[in-house]
Regions:
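Alpha/beta-hydrolase fold nucleophile elbow
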Residues: 233-245
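A catalytic-pocket lid/entrance helix-loop region that shapes and gates access to the active site
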Residues: 169-181, 254-314, 360-371, 375-385
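Catalytic-loop region of hydrolases
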Residues: 2-11, 26-184, 189, 457
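C-terminal motif of bacterial Sec signal peptides marking the signal peptidase cleavage site
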Residues: 21-25
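Glycine-rich nucleophile elbow surrounding the catalytic serine of serine-hydrolase chemistry
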Residues: 133, 223-224, 242-254
């Protein structure tokens, strides 16, 4: 389930500043930080860490993204001729056992366009999810950050468990396609039982196929990977741009390594103090607000969906209910149901330049044409949204992206909550009040970790000494 982005720069600034101040209390001791970092232990561990920190990266021209990264073509050169370079970083499978097994993380970078005197260092991006491939995403979004490249090397990576970084797989030929499962059951019977069964069977498939890595794909371990990357890149500080889930990853990094935090932007801040249910509720409100902004814009543009934002929101709620009962057939044998409608809308809300396409798609649905929104959802997918899993991914196809599987694995590793149907049903009124459009889906997404085979725990995000979060990167 996707995570809402900030609506405006002003909101981002105030939210980020509040986050910084809220993370400074109750700081852990140096001994506790060393335990969390995995830097204590035996002489063997110390030597292993030294070897990891002094490794060299073998940068080469990037190939096309692998199927697990979402596929596609090799990234084209930037307008000034700069070629994208890719490498792998060797890191411990388990940071609490740094002398044990290692895994490789996929990296990508574009060198700065500035002079050596202008260069500040590397700027590391995480575009959210969790589950999104940074290696596949960064080239497509690079035009948005070209000004930053005058001062930084632009760098991203596939976090552990994602894409080409020991990507989690939950393949099982016996699993139904997720599109066949009603994600917002309202019958309290067969539909609800089918959703519960799907989540539990998916969890079992994840253990069967990726059980060795499942305990180690959480955000705390990923943050430790980022500090290793900082050192191997030769930077004294980590300069960081995190979007959506990437803000949580940045907050955990700041908790573990406050002395190495450089310039940082957290865009669309996720509140790290909320449990999974409260976070989902906040997301529902965020999506509702974003859709109301779209609806206001649409009305001002004279779209045929309604005379004002209230009319457009009401019409869309009605469309979702109608499509839930009677999906629209689309060319190629597909269909647009209520869940698919919400997926398409939520994906298009991440950027205002997607709004015209969303307007056209919704107007087409009112004329019984679901093809436009189906195509929009497919076009946005992971890379267009900046971090939201694409529910159209076929998790039984080994040639498909693993973004959904990674989303599930990282989410469940980062939470001790294992919600039940009763938990969801008791909170549904709150979600419906927050958003009749997005609330039900986000409420039922709380069942994602039901039956998960390994225990989880929320990452610590106290971040003593984090300082100012949002700064001018140029």
């Amino acid at each position: 389930m996707p995570t809402a982005r900030a609506i405006s720069t002003a909101v981002l600034l105030s939210t980020a500043t509040l986050l910084a101040s809220s993370l400074t209390a109750c700081a852990p001791s140096d001994q506790e930080r060393d335990r969390q970092r995995g830097t204590g232990g035996t002489t063997t561990d110390a030597q292993a860490l030294t070897n990891l920190r002094t490794q060299s990266l073998d940068w080469k021209p990037c190939a096309a993204p692998s199927p697990l990264q979402g596929g596609g073509e090799a990234p084209a050169a930037l307008p000034d001729g700069t070629r994208w370079q890719c490498a792998t970083l060797r890191t411990p499978l388990n940071w609490k056992d740094p002398s044990g097994e290692t895994i490789d993380l996929a990296l990508i970078r574009a060198r700065t366009s500035g002079t050596p005197d202008d260069r500040i260092g590397s700027l590391l991006f995480n575009f959210g999810g969790p589950g999104g491939s940074g290696v596949a995403t960064l080239p497509g979004l690079a035009p948005d950050y070209e000004k930053l490249r005058t001062r930084y090397d632009l760098v991203s990576f596939d976090p552990r468990g994602v894409g080409a970084s020991s990507g989690v797989r939950c393949l099982d030929a016996g699993l139904p396609d997720e599109d066949e499962i009603d994600q917002t059951p309202d019958d309290g019977g067969d539909e609800t039982n089918a959703l519960v069964r799907f989540n539990r069977e998916t969890a079992a498939a994840c253990k069967k196929n990726s059980g060795d890595v499942l305990p180690y794909v959480g955000t705390t371990q990923a943050a430790q990977d980022m500090d290793l990357l900082r050192q191997v890149l030769g930077d004294d500080e980590l300069h960081y741009f995190g979007i959506s889930y990437g803000t949580e990853l940045g907050g955990v990094y700041a908790h573990l390594f406050p002395e190495h935090v450089g310039r940082a932007v957290l865009d669309g801040v996720v509140d790290p103090t909320q449990d999974a249910m409260e976070e989902a509720l906040a997301q529902a409100g965020g999506f509702q607000l974003a859709f109301e902004h779209f609806a206001n814009w649409c009305a001002q543009q004279g779209c045929t969906l309604g005379d004002d934002a209230e009319d457009i929101v009401g019409l869309t709620v009605g469309l979702e209910e109608t499509l839930d009962d009677t999906p629209l057939a689309t060319p190629g044998g597909g269909e647009l149901d209520g869940d698919a409608l919400i997926d398409a809308i939520s994906g298009a809300l991440y950027r205002q330049d997607y709004w015209p396409a969303l307007r056209v798609g919704l107007e087409a649905v009112t004329d019984d044409n679901g093809e436009v929104l189906e195509d929009l959802a497919e076009a946005l997918g992971q890379h267009g949204r900046g971090g939201a899993p694409d529910d159209d991914t076929d998790d039984t196809d080994p040639d498909e992206s693993n973004e959904d599987d990674a989303f599930r694995a990282i989410t469940c590793d980062d939470s001790s909550n294992r919600y039940t149907v009763a938990d969801v049903q008791s909170r549904l009124p709150d979600f419906l009040e927050a958003s009749p459009l997005f609330g039900p889906g986000l409420a039922w997404s709380a069942l994602t970790c039901d039956g998960w085979p390994v225990p989880g725990a929320a990452p610590a995000v106290l971040a003593e000494g984090f300082g100012e979060v949002l700064q001018d990167l140029t």
